[in-house]
Structures are given as C-alpha cells and as structure tokens.
Amino acid sequence: MAKKELAKIKLQIPAGVANPSPPVGPALGQHGLNIMQFCKEFNARTQDQKGMIIPVVITAYADRSFTFITKTPPAAVLIMKAAKIDKGSGEPNRNKVGKISIEQVEEIAKLKLPDLTAKDLDSAKRSIIGTARSMGIEIK
C-alpha cells in the first residue's frame, strides 16, 4: 500500500546552505518532519549550484517521512545573473537596467525547459524574453 500523503510544501532555498532557521524549520516542523535530515540531503543535492535560489517541493507523509524534488532556479534569478544586476527595474517601461543577448536567452530557456509549461524551445524563449522585459532588461 502506498504511503498516505500529508502535505506538499513549496519553498525557495539558497542552494547548498539550507539550515533549520526560517523558512525551512517552521515549514517542516509543523508537519513533524526531521529538519536536519532534509537540510543535509538538500545541501548534498545542490552543492554544485551554490549561490542560486532553488525551488523545492517537499512531500510529507503520515509516517513523518518525506521526499523532495528540486527544480531549476527561477527565470528571474537566471536573467539577473546573465545581465549581472542585483535587481530588476522599478519602472521597466521607462528605466532599462541591463541587456542580455538572444544567445543568453536561449541558454536560460534550455535550462528552464523541463520546468516550464512550454512545448518547445521557441515558446520557452518567448516566455524568458517576456520575463526579462517585465524586469526592465533589453534583449539585443
């Protein structure tokens, strides 16, 4: 018989540096999960992506066990890294804060493709371009 699923917890945690402090501790603690075990497993799985924010979906089961799936970093984080900026524009239609090339857009789209609802690379690229424009970043 399959385990009874208690909850799905979605978090965004910096890669390789998960610790029991908020937001991880309270989110897992309220479901009775072993926080340190999760932190060790997450850090081991993401140590090659240090510095990136990694979305994770944790499935908690009734017997207090858990499984988790790591996703690709958010598109906005990848775009900011490619444009070498700290944050997007407050007024994206007026103030442009950076530029990225079509090649960089394609690279980000290839990386994000498994997590996007896009059917092919072209629609994934359009999605990434839309995100970049809404952040005040020009595509050259």
From Swiss-Prot:
**Could you tell me which InterPro entries the record lists for this protein?**
Ribosomal_uL11 (IPR000911), Ribosomal_uL11_bac-typ (IPR006519), Ribosomal_uL11_C (IPR020783), Ribosomal_uL11_C_sf (IPR036769), Ribosomal_uL11_N (IPR020784), Ribosomal_uL11_N_sf (IPR036796)
**Coiled-coil blocks:** none
| Top-rank taxon | Bacteria
User: What SMART domains does UniProt report for this protein, alphabetically?
Assistant: RL11 (SM00649)
Q: Mind telling me how this protein is modified after translation? A: One or more lysine residues are methylated.
Methyltransferase as UniProt keyword: no
Ribosomal protein found in the keyword field = yes
Please give the Pfam families that the UniProt record associates with this protein.
Ribosomal_L11 (PF00298), Ribosomal_L11_N (PF03946)
The cysteines covalently paired via disulfide bonds are none
GO MF terms on file?
large ribosomal subunit rRNA binding; structural constituent of ribosome
Q: Which Gene3D superfamilies match?
A: Ribosomal protein L11, C-terminal domain, Ribosomal protein L11/L12, N-terminal domain
Q: Which GO terms describe its biological process?
A: translation
Q: Which UniProt keywords apply?
A: Methylation, Ribonucleoprotein, Ribosomal protein, RNA-binding, rRNA-binding
Q: Name one GO cellular component term.
A: cytosolic large ribosomal subunit
**Subunit notes for this chain?**
Part of the ribosomal stalk of the 50S ribosomal subunit. Interacts with L10 and the large rRNA to form the base of the stalk. L10 forms an elongated spine to which L12 dimers bind in a sequential fashion forming a multimeric L10(L12)X complex.
Which HAMAP family does the record associate with it?
A: Ribosomal_uL11
Its biological purpose: Forms part of the ribosomal stalk which helps the ribosome interact with GTP-bound translation factors.
Protein family according to the UniProt entry? Belongs to the universal ribosomal protein uL11 family.
Which protein are we looking at? Large ribosomal subunit protein uL11
Species of the source: Lawsonia intracellularis (strain PHE/MN1-00)
What high-level taxonomic lineage is stated for the organism? Bacteria, Pseudomonadati, Thermodesulfobacteriota, Desulfovibrionia, Desulfovibrionales
The gene designation is: rplK
